[in-house]
Amino acid sequence: MSKKAEAWMKKRGWTPQRFQCDAWNALGAQRQGIVNALTGSGKTYSILLPYLFDLHQSKSKSPLQCIWITPIKALAKEIQSAAQRVIDECQLPIRVGIRTGDTEGKERQRQQKAWPNILITTPESLHLIFCKKKNTDIWSALQLLVVDEWHELMGSKRGVQMELALAHLRHLRPQVLVWGISATIGNLHEALHVLLGPAHAAKGELIQSSIIKRTEVIPIQPDKPERMPWAGHLGIHLLPKLLPILRESQSTLIFTNVRSQCEIWYRSLMEAAPDLAGTTAIHHGSISKEIRDWVESSLHAGKLHCVICTSSLDLGVDFAPVETIVQIGGPKGIARFMQRAGRSGHSPDGKSRIYFLPTHSLELIECAALQLGLQQGELEKREPYIQCFDVLIQWLVTLGCGDGFRPEDVLESIRATHCYQHIQDDEFLWCLNFAAAKGTSLHEYPEYHKIQPIDGLWLVNNQRIARRHRMSIGTIVSDTLVAVRMRGAGLLGHIEESFIAQLHEGDAFWFAGMSVELMELKELTAKVKKSKRTDGRSPVWLGGSLPLTSKMSHLIRQKIEEASESAPTPSQDPIIQFIRPIFNLQAERSHIPNTREMLIEQFESEDGYHTMFYPFEGKFVHEGLAALIAHRIGEQKPMSFSIATNDYGFELLSNKVIEVHADLVRHWFRVDHLERDLLAGVNGAELAGRQFRDIATIAGLLFKGYPGQPIRDRHLQSSAQLLFRVFQDYDVDNLLIRQSYNELVYRQFDILRMRDALDRILSAEIIITRPDRPTPFAFPILVDRLRERMSSESLKERIAQMTIAWTS
């Protein structure tokens, strides 16, 4: 097997890597597992070549022999090109097809008449095939299942979708081989276990590349740190420093963490350097497929000089011409940063160069922490989901839409997954009955009777239910989307209803890198025209924040310790030396904590009495901690608080002085009754109800409407709230309610990480200072609180006033 693949690679002037040879040999021996290697090192060919040269059987009774799963549609084209390159050069009798949400209807029909030998698809599109009648015949010659970018899927419910699909196909075709491809992940052995399932994981192969890719991280800094705002606006003030880098590079990807940042940066870049307009583009998941395709192909052809993007270009789409990567703001995790850095030097021996542009000066600490993390070579884990009853209910209806199922067969199949390996008989029976609306509070409503037993086979026997289910398959839940159509130019993309509903006809806003004016909003279609106005708003999407990983939190605390009074020697890190004036001011007014200390500051301003806590655990954990501590303080002495958080700490603002001393702090941060007090502090029922909306959508309780007739977001929300109250009051054993609280506690607030943080704080020395004015650590948190209730212009004025008053 290796000889054929090796000969083809040598013909192209490539040298096979050791991990590629190991993968070829493993497939030749009919083994399965995960290939783990860096971006651009040849992971795709490590699995693809063995199939093309040896595993493919030209005389098979069914053409479909290999399914290649990708988490993003953009990657499908690249995989198809990689396969087609070999097929054309070697004249192999193999057909490759793509089936995603973007595939045209005619192509889908052609595929159903004659399936390709290799089908490249997404988890959702694969599940749609399971909805087809007689779909069992499609898999009759299946030999190979490949899950690309497995690290992206594993920590999400899309990963659970894949677990169910893999277990089902294995049940139908026990001899099928399963392989995962992963670039960057910390818990590889667990990833292998989740991919292959408990029965096969022990014999799975973990093939890792020994290639160490050089990564150069370069911070973009102002001339003096005093010129950098302590709580800036997206780093735009450093644009003059970025422009020379863009002009010197042949091609650049500028990564932002969220789509709204992406739009603002494109707009700012065009205003600052209009000469770049013809060679600069924008790319994110809400822009239309046509625009994204054009950007990708133009970048690949070397026609674009710069692309501002989000994680939509994180993954392995092969853009070899990319020379430089820029990261705007902290990426919040080492693995994500490495993934993005790997987009440059996208070849096994290429060197990655990534510039770090901070949005405010303290964020430079993240750059120093990332450099340390890259040196240590440790990556974050992806925590897999377990007991996702919403996904299981959707899966039962999917099987019912297709060839039907027998419960005993499905139970055996799902127990072969990591997610459901410990599911109890009564839990499975509850899900089965819930999908049939048996014995539940929904029994009187026909639309919830989705499946029913017919001669021992459970089926969907209603075409309307089947059609609505096919339209709802998936686990990605977002706000209702509004199509944005340009007059005379077609679809630009989609914006969430919650943003567009705030606009009036004639208002300007920025989208897809251009200023447009809203002409009409009708039936969730926004008709727009080009506008010359530059004062339009930038859209905001829900879910627009990334949590700081626990590993990054630990590294940040280490770098801060280097600047503390307890550091044995002055830090030699150039970044720490550069922002030394800020640390000096922090030390002068308060204290710089080491890793064995917990800093608390108290001061008074015209807004009230501020108590600042600095665990350095990330914004998501701080939101939970702030609510927890506020609740526990309020139990002792009733008072109201305003809460603000960022990645470094949180603020409790009150109209009364809070008594603070070390014993009280340890009482507030105690671990006992953590879940009870947390849910009380955050109004757990209210937040669990919001979590329930997503769960109810996945489980098929909420239907978002037909094409052209979408159901508005507020109606979906009210329906979800009604169902939540009904289940809580009349269905005490409802597993979806239980799941809502579990996801709130274990996912949103990450109670396990919070418990670790509490343990660390309890063992730390409590340092309490009372500065006469806010400190550099406090200032960004204060600004975040003001940002919630002030316009951007008013906020800029207030920041300027505060900076003058508090730095004098």
What are these regions (language model features)?
Residues 489-508:
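A conserved acidic, glycine/proline-rich C-terminal tail/linker
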Residues 522-539:
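Short, solvent-exposed secondary-structure boundary/capping segments
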Residues 476-478, 503, 510:
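Short, well-ordered loop/turn sites that connect or cap secondary structure elements
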